[in-house]
Design a protein with these regions (language model features):
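Intrinsically disordered, low-complexity serine/threonine- and proline-rich regulatory segments
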Residues: 1-13
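Sparse, context-dependent recognition of short Cys/His-centered cofactor- or disulfide-binding micro-motifs
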Residues: 3, 53, 88, 92
Length: 126
């Protein structure tokens, strides 16, 4: 599916699944169309809607969402290619444990970090 269809299906909560690389792809596609704040709001709204529709509104984690967006948007700066080419150029983004370089488990797993974005306590985000 192309980026436009992906964003439409994400916004309409009609994606059949939403694994890690789909999260990255939505950020990649949306950040080509909007600034950082609008991209964050788009993902926040969509993921919250998806979690609620799946009967698990508590699954949303604001710090994880915003941190991943910031990592993808920073890596995307100046990039002109497809999503697959982007992932090939930035294989570190495939690592689901990448946030561990920026956050301690105590902070990342806290209720406060789940509810509101927390700045990292290990290494700054871009």
């Amino acid at each position: 599916m192309d980026d436009d269809e992906l964003l439409e299906r994400f916004a309409g909560n009609t994606l059949p699944a939403f694994p890690h690389e789909e999260h990255l792809h939505v950020v990649f596609a949306q950040s080509a169309r909007a600034d950082l704040d609008a991209t964050i709001n788009f993902l926040r709204d969509g993921i919250r809607k998806m979690a609620a529709a799946n009967g698990n509104p508590g699954a949303y984690h604001d710090t994880r969402t915003v941190a991943w967006i910031r990592l993808v948007v920073a890596a995307r700066a100046g990039f002109d290619g497809t999503f697959d080419e982007f992932l090939d150029a930035h294989p570190e983004l495939r690592r689901r444990d990448l946030l561990d370089e920026h956050y301690s488990p105590d902070l990342l797993n806290s209720d406060a970090a789940r509810a509101f974005f927390a700045e990292p306590d290990r290494a700054p985000l871009p």
